[in-house]
Curated annotation (Swiss-Prot):
Functions as an E3 ubiquitin ligase. The keyword Repeat applies. It catalyses: S-ubiquitinyl-[E2 ubiquitin-conjugating enzyme]-L-cysteine + [acceptor protein]-L-lysine = [E2 ubiquitin-conjugating enzyme]-L-cysteine + N(6)-ubiquitinyl-[acceptor protein]-L-lysine. Pfam families: U-box. Pathway: Protein modification; protein ubiquitination. This is U-box domain-containing protein 31. Gene3D superfamilies: Leucine-rich Repeat Variant, Zinc/RING finger domain, C3HC4 (zinc finger). Residues 59-133 form the U-box domain. GO terms for molecular function: ubiquitin protein ligase activity. It comes from Arabidopsis thaliana (Mouse-ear cress). The lineage of its organism: Eukaryota, Viridiplantae, Streptophyta, Embryophyta, Tracheophyta. GO terms for biological process: protein ubiquitination. Its EC number is 2.3.2.27. It is an enzyme of class 2 (transferase). PANTHER family: U-BOX DOMAIN-CONTAINING PROTEIN 31 (PTHR22849:SF142), WDSAM1 PROTEIN (PTHR22849).
Length: 444
């Protein structure tokens, strides 16, 4: 938990002398002497440990923090040196043989630990105040989310768009609102707004909410209706960049569902829209969600064939140098999947950048990338051995393969590299191939 930095004048120097003064001086709040008085029934007394675990506070007064664990104290005790620690932590310190104060390193002339009741009360009061305020805000947020859902159920036209926009803001700002929307049947209400006649204004707001909610299997099944997927595809092509990203992410979550049907994503419009996101050089935030969805759908044969037909192979190959590690792994996975189809292998062979771009990635990014790249190179070199192997060797493949073989990579990857190296050597004399394998001209 983050620790509040003490003030330059030393704060309390580790001592709490008077609870009333501490409250008055603003330790419990904003320094104006005002604070929330927490009154609890003894039977319903708030548990300090529970409050600390539930509250995610960016700042906590340093006087509440145990110097050993750097966590808020629940049972503070003070040593003869005047330093205060969490009881369990200081007892562990003593049990391992230490007889000094952890902070000052002074020899202890007395190992007695004295409960610091004043500090404990101050800690309890401070956390209680924060906890009660958090609960009150949560109730306010829940009430607001329920109110907006009620409005949404009967709203029409611009009022519907306004209600969705308000709900989106609440959902994105408060985790409790997401749960409230789900618990109150909001997923069904919002999903029912998606139809062939839905305007993009309504659809984009609805999808922005849905993509931020926890969806169960029934909710996903409802969203997998062809008309709703079709609307998402339309907005992926024609919406704003934020809407396109949300559509890609939401469809990606549906694809993972057990009952998902491949024909729902075997769509020319969907794949073209995703490739537009991948190629968009001005707005790169859409690349990762697009490639992630392409990776998920490329396991289906009909999708692979359609990807080849829309010209995805050279487009994906050409963007490889611009991608980060995560995106590279997804793009190479897709290209490797396309090698399963004869048309895909031909398209990879015919793309002028396939060999130089994939060779350049070997041993440079990650083992996954190296694995996919070698698999792609194997497919194209096997298809046109003399033409592709010679080109690959000329751009440094042989030396890179030797590095893979000598590395600590997976044995199966090293075996595939050895087989590819052997395939490349068939079109050279021994002396010529050995010269091509020299490491001096590789690995920038």
């Amino acid at each position: 938990m983050p620790m509040f930095q003490p003030s330059k004048n030393g704060g309390f120097d580790g001592h709490i002398l008077d609870l009333h003064s501490a409250v008055k001086d603003g330790v419990l709040g904003g320094g104006d002497g005002k604070f929330l008085v927490v009154v609890t029934d003894e039977k319903k007394k708030l548990d300090l440990k529970e409050m600390i675990s539930e509250l995610e506070l960016p700042e906590i007064p340093s006087v509440f923090i145990c110097p050993i664990s750097l966590e808020p104290m629940q049972d503070p005790v003070t040593l003869c040196t005047g330093q205060t620690y969490e009881r369990s932590n200081i007892l562990k310190w003593f049990n391992i043989g230490h007889c000094t104060c952890p902070t000052t390193m002074q020899e202890l002339w007395d190992d007695l630990v004295t409960p610091n009741k004043t500090l404990h009360q101050l800690i309890y009061t401070w956390f209680s105040q924060k906890y009660v305020l958090m609960k009150k805000r949560s109730e306010d947020v829940q009430g607001r989310a329920i109110e907006i859902l009620g409005t949404l159920r009967k709203a029409k036209g611009k009022a519907k768009v306004h209600a969705l926009s308000e709900l989106k803001q609440v959902v994105m700002a408060h985790a409790i609102a997401k749960k409230t929307v789900v618990d109150e049947g909001g997923v069904f209400v919002i999903s029912s707004l998606l139809s062939p006649f839905t305007s993009h204004a309504v659809g984009s707001e609805a999808i922005a909410i849905l993509v931020n909610l926890e969806l169960d299997s029934d909710s996903k099944a409802g969203l997998m209706q062809p008309a709703r997927v079709s609307l998402m595809v339309d907005m992926l092509n024609d919406g704003s960049i934020e809407t396109k990203i949300n559509c890609a992410r939401l469809i990606g979550r549906l694809v993972e569902e057990k009952g998902f049907r491949a024909e729902l994503v075997s769509s020319h419009s969907l794949l073209v829209g995703l490739m537009r996101l991948v190629k968009d050089r001005r707005r790169r935030n859409g690349v990762s969600p697009a490639l992630t969805l392409l990776k998920s759908v490329s396991v289906h044969k009909q999708v692979r064939n359609l990807l080849v037909r829309i010209g995805a192979v050279p487009q994906l190959v050409d963007v490889l140098p611009c991608l980060d590690v995560e995106c590279l792994e997804s793009a190479l996975f897709v290209l490797d999947s396309l090698c399963l189809e004869s048309e895909g292998r031909i398209a990879l062979k015919d793309s002028v950048n396939t060999i130089p771009h994939t060779v350049r990635l070997l041993m440079k990014v990650s083992e996954k990338c190296t694995n996919y790249a070698i698999s792609i190179l194997w497919s194209v070199c096997k298809l046109a051995s003399e033409e592709c192997s010679s080109l690959a060797v000329e751009v440094g493949l042989a030396a890179k393969l030797l590095l893979v073989i000598q590395s600590g990579c997976d044995p199966a990857l090293k075996q595939r590299s050895a087989e590819l190296l052997k395939l490349c050597s068939l079109h050279y004399s021994d002396s010529m191939f050995i010269s091509k394998c020299k490491l001096t001209r590789t690995i920038q």
